[in-house]
Amino acid sequence: PVYRELGNQAIKATDMPVVAFSVGEEELAGIDTKPLVGHLAAWNYFESIDTPANKEFIAKWKAFTKNPKRVTNDPMEAHVVGFQMWVEAVKKAGTVNPDKVIDALPGIKAPNLTGGISEMLPNHHITKPVFIGEVRGDGQFDVVWKTEGLVPGAAWSPHLEGSKDLVADWV
């Protein structure tokens, strides 16, 4: 892992800050994070985000695992939001028939753990906030930047030739 090697090479964030897009609390849980303090990560969720819903989720997770050191992470929060949206789509469709639930998903809204309300778009990507967090010595992140609101999920990059003209509308 890149963060471990940064520590091994004594590369500090003050020398060359690194932004990771796939390193979160779970990945940092097994390594010494003190040499990594100040490096950055970008996610839609960090365990350290201080909202009542997030505190409740973390407490339930730690109780379920019977391990106060187990961390939460962005993929877990995404599943919480996605499952809530699925439940609402089942209610709207009046059935668990997958085709009918898929048709019911666009426009469904559900609270996320960071304090906002996410929405399922017609392309089956959801709106989420974006955060940049700075690694702390305890393996958590301090949020140093966030989007003003929720960012719509895009299925294709407008910057990649061959995908810029594609449209994702699954329904």
Where are these regions (language model features)?
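Extracytosolic ligand-binding ectodomains
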Residues: 1-171
